[in-house]
């Protein structure tokens, strides 16, 4: 049986695509997992994948700090190599981030194929530095193709969990009514700035007849301060596929994973890029969706309540039965999301891995 080591760690943007690939191959392949201690993978990776954690970090800084980081990278690579040898691994799959560097180096050390998947339009530092040493590089968005030196990336899209690809019911706790459903998502790390923007606009939208589901993330001190029968605030939900499939409009950060989930659900979106994202990659991700007419971009530094509120009102004008609404822009946005979607990304990646295993 072919043995695959997955190296994915940190945020949902790295973990969820890797989990989708693991689910796609586990009937035919034996899957193991390597991550970093005290990160999200310790909660999300199923026990059957036998998570092994190694200490890995970034390569920022200069002088002594850089030397210490290089030493830690070497030690992490040795640990991953040990896991490869112990489990007789045939191939490595990684989604970037801190754990990707030792995984790529260890795979090269052991002379086994390694596939790197980059979800973002602007590749991360590890992808830019080490993509040339991988057996294959796959990308989620076309804009990344010319930004990975020394490689010829394959466009596969970004994998999503299987529940996004099959019809899901609307969660029973969603407010009932005839008004349009607006779903707000801050991502796996939450979004304080986005929450503030949304809360400034929500009272008016509720007054006009919207139903609102707001997933705030863990670090939100103001949850449930606003009470309304058509508003539900939760820190997290494991029923996001059902929410997005039934939503009329979503407000979201512009992580590549979130955009991929919106796309396969054909959910029109207002994207608010995280302004501190590395290399402004969320801005570039949002631009890819907006170029297809699938999304509208609102920036966090813009006057918060008027811009976001007016954008949502314009997009929902027909459903809110506003008298000056002429046509429904949501239909065209759904078509844009459908054009952006890659519904078989995990199968494409599984096939790519299979071609590389001798």
UniProtKB/Swiss-Prot annotation:
GO molecular function: UDP-N-acetyl-D-glucosamine:N-acetylmuramoyl-L-alanyl-D-glutamyl-meso-2,6-diaminopimelyl-D-alanyl-D-alanine-diphosphoundecaprenol 4-beta-N-acetylglucosaminlytransferase activity; undecaprenyldiphospho-muramoylpentapeptide beta-N-acetylglucosaminyltransferase activity
Species of the source: Synechococcus sp. (strain CC9605)
EC class name: transferase
UniProt-listed Enzyme Commission number(s): 2.4.1.227
HAMAP family linked: MurG
Main location (coarse class): membrane
GO terms of biological process kind: carbohydrate metabolic process; cell division; cell wall organization; lipid glycosylation; peptidoglycan biosynthetic process; regulation of cell shape
Record's keyword terms, sorted: Cell cycle, Cell division, Cell inner membrane, Cell membrane, Cell shape, Cell wall biogenesis/degradation, Glycosyltransferase, Membrane, Peptidoglycan synthesis, Transferase
Taxonomic superkingdom: Bacteria
Reactions mediated catalytically: di-trans,octa-cis-undecaprenyl diphospho-N-acetyl-alpha-D-muramoyl-L-alanyl-D-glutamyl-meso-2,6-diaminopimeloyl-D-alanyl-D-alanine + UDP-N-acetyl-alpha-D-glucosamine = di-trans,octa-cis-undecaprenyl diphospho-[N-acetyl-alpha-D-glucosaminyl-(1->4)]-N-acetyl-alpha-D-muramoyl-L-alanyl-D-glutamyl-meso-2,6-diaminopimeloyl-D-alanyl-D-alanine + UDP + H(+)
Subcellular location: Cell inner membrane
Protein name listed in UniProt: UDP-N-acetylglucosamine--N-acetylmuramyl-(pentapeptide) pyrophosphoryl-undecaprenol N-acetylglucosamine transferase
